[in-house]
């Protein structure tokens, strides 16, 4: 009987003493160590992705706001697409750094002081952030229910809770505060809007709901179940290009008078592609102005700023936009849904859940209800989570968006560059997974079937596509689970599996699973370089095991 993969792993660890090369984090410095005495500092060379050192320092200072990275032997965390780490101002853990001048970039002190705006829009406060440490503060001194009591503490809690609605409204620049509905996250929001539309909008069997293979299960399964149970509506899938972007011309041809809903992710949680949202919405609305466009912004909200009024002026505003707080530095269990007021007024939507906080009067046989948004927020909400979500948005708002995008994509380009340097012809960069005709496609980075090590990545940036710093990688020589297990031994966190996007893997990439690296602005170049080294080293080792007959 062949030994299991786990047995081989244990054996290799003992023989090779593999753990002698791991990621270390000290309190005052970040370094990559082959042993405590030897450190590999990041160095820039010709041909490498480059960014000004001052920009790197900006984000290293912002990283200081995150208590997670202050712990001893802190992991190198590359799973921010699953959930982000939380800053101290959100969760209520004190940080030792208190002076604002620590965030002033050296670039701001050069002869060209306006070359870069500071990523933090500094206030007159002597502290880095005017926002208190909300989660702890609320539960320790402000804990009261909202929309119920008339005593001061309850009124204060209600005021803080409703202020977040205004914060989100201003952040996405929508028309009205009552267009913002608090949810427990994107899954809740998608189930809520799915239920409402299936009740009021989808009336016939031929009514169409358009999705893509790129969607998270939360944007597929609710539609499938509602269509099956209510026996009305039908699901259609929007064609994709081989690069993973929506084929807008073919989408336009498919939109007709039966099209009722188009529900898409702005950013894929596996590929990281940023869809051309304005062009997609315009194409839909030009063919059917009554079609309802839903945008899953779970992966995009932390990286992209939305201006819904501007989009509305250009006839490319989504009717619904949904996001999860924990994906943009807020606590778990909170999120929001933007629901256009004209839509609510036209269809008189009914809520998914019934209970308290949503009624005006209750009779023996029927009740009268509040107006939106309270109509859709039944029961006791996650008050502390919502208030902390407002603090997280204020935190993000202080970071310069253009600088953030440049830095994150610099980290992404660095990762791809170093993978290429370490693996050479063994790195296969695919511009796509499935061709438009349905056959296999892909580009090759020059790898041959006889190469000792092959690692595939889907890199749409290679063809000029816009994306956020998410990189899927896999091999036909070893399992992504083995890769991630070995990385975990090295104190590195990335994810493996289908990433709640089974259709994308099966129908587009045509693989059973993959590993995923998702970067965020608190990651550092040193971490990324170490990650690339370890992925390459482990990939070569696992490929060698496979060639030796170990499976």
From Swiss-Prot:
Recorded superkingdom: Eukaryota
Cofactor dependency: pyridoxal 5'-phosphate
Signal sequence annotation: 1-22
Pathway(s) of this molecule: Cofactor biosynthesis; iron-sulfur cluster biosynthesis
An example molecular function term from Gene Ontology annotations: transferase activity
Subcellular locations according to the entry: Plastid, Apicoplast
Catalytic activity: (sulfur carrier)-H + L-cysteine = (sulfur carrier)-SH + L-alanine
Modified residues (N6-(pyridoxal phosphate)lysine): 327
Record's keyword terms, sorted: Apicoplast, Plastid, Pyridoxal phosphate, Signal, Transferase
Record has Plastid as a keyword: yes
Chief place where the protein resides: plastid
InterPro entries named in the record: Aminotrans_V_dom, PyrdxlP-dep_Trfase, PyrdxlP-dep_Trfase_major, PyrdxlP-dep_Trfase_small
Residues annotated as catalytic: 500 (cysteine persulfide intermediate)
EC number: 2.8.1.7
GO cellular component: apicoplast
Described purpose of this protein according to its UniProt entry: Catalyzes sulfur activation and mobilization in sulfur mobilization (SUF) pathway for iron-sulfur (Fe-S) cluster biogenesis. Active when in complex with a partner protein SufE. Required for apicoplast maintenance. Plays a role in the development of sporozoites in oocysts in mosquitoes.
Similarity remark: Belongs to the class-V pyridoxal-phosphate-dependent aminotransferase family. Csd subfamily.
Self-association state and partner proteins as the record states: Monomer. Interacts with SufE; interaction enhances cysteine desulfurase activity of SufS.
Protein's name in the database: Cysteine desulfurase SufS
Gene giving rise to this polypeptide: SufS
């Amino acid at each position: 009987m062949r030994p299991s993969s786990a047995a081989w792993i244990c054996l290799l660890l003992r023989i090779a003493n593999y753990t002698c090369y791991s990621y270390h984090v000290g309190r005052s410095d970040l370094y990559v160590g082959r042993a405590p005495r030897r450190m590999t500092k990041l160095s820039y060379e010709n041909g490498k992705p480059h960014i000004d050192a001052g920009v790197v320092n900006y984000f290293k200072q912002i990283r200081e706001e995150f208590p997670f990275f202050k712990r001893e032997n802190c992991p190198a965390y590359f799973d921010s697409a699953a959930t982000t780490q939380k800053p101290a101002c959100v969760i209520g853990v004190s940080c030792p750094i208190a002076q604002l001048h620590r965030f002033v970039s050296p670039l701001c002190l050069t002869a060209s002081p306006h070359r870069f705006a500071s990523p933090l829009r500094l206030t007159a406060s002597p502290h880095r952030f005017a926002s208190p440490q909300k989660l702890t503060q609320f539960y320790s001194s402000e804990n009261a229910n909202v929309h119920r009591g008339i005593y001061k503490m309850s009124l204060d809690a209600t005021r803080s809770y409703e202020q977040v609605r205004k914060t989100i409204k201003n952040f996405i620049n929508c028309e009205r505060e009552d267009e913002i509905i608090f949810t427990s996250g994107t899954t809740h929001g998608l189930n809520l809007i799915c239920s409402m539309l299936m009740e009021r909008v989808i009336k016939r069997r031929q009514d169409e709901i358009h999705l893509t293979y790129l969607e998270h299960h939360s944007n597929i399964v609710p539609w499938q179940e509602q269509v099956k149970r209510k026996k009305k509506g039908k699901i259609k899938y929007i064609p994709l290009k081989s690069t993973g972007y929506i084929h807008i011309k073919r989408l336009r041809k498919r939109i007709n008078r039966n099209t009722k809903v188009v529900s898409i992710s702005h950013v894929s949680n596996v590929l990281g592609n940023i869809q051309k949202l304005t062009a997609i919405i315009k194409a839909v609305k030009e063919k059917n102005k009554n079609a309802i466009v839903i945008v899953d912004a779970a992966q995009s909200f932390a990286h992209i700023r939305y201006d819904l009024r501007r989009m509305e002026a250009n006839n490319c505003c989504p009717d619904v936009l949904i996001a999860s707080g924990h994906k943009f530095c807020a606590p778990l269990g909170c999120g929001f849904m933007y629901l256009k007021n004209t839509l609510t007024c036209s269809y008189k939507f009914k809520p998914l859940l019934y209970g308290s906080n949503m009624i005006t009067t209750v009779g023996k046989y029927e009740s009268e209800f509040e107006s939106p948004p309270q109509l859709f927020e039944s029961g006791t909400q996650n008050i502390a989570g919502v208030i902390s979500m407002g603090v997280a948005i204020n935190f993000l708002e202080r970071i310069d968006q253009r600088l953030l995008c440049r830095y994150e994509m610099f980290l992404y380009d660095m990762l791809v560059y170093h993978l290429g340097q370490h693996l050479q012809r063994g790195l296969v960069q695919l511009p796509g997974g499935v061709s438009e005709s349905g056959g296999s496609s892909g580009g090759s980075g020059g790898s041959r079937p006889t190469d000792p090590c092959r690692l595939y990545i889907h890199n749409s940036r290679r063809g000029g596509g816009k994306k956020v710093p998410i990189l899927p990688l896999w091999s036909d020589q070893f399992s992504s689970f083995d890769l991630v297990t070995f990385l975990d031994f090295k104190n590195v966190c990335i994810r493996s599996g289908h990433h709640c996007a089974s259709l994308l893997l099966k129908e587009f990439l045509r693989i059973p699973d993959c590993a995923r690296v998702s970067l965020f602005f608190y990651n550092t170049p040193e971490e990324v370089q170490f990650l690339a080294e370890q992925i390459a080293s482990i990939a070569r080792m696992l490929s060698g095991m496979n060639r030796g007959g170990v499976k």
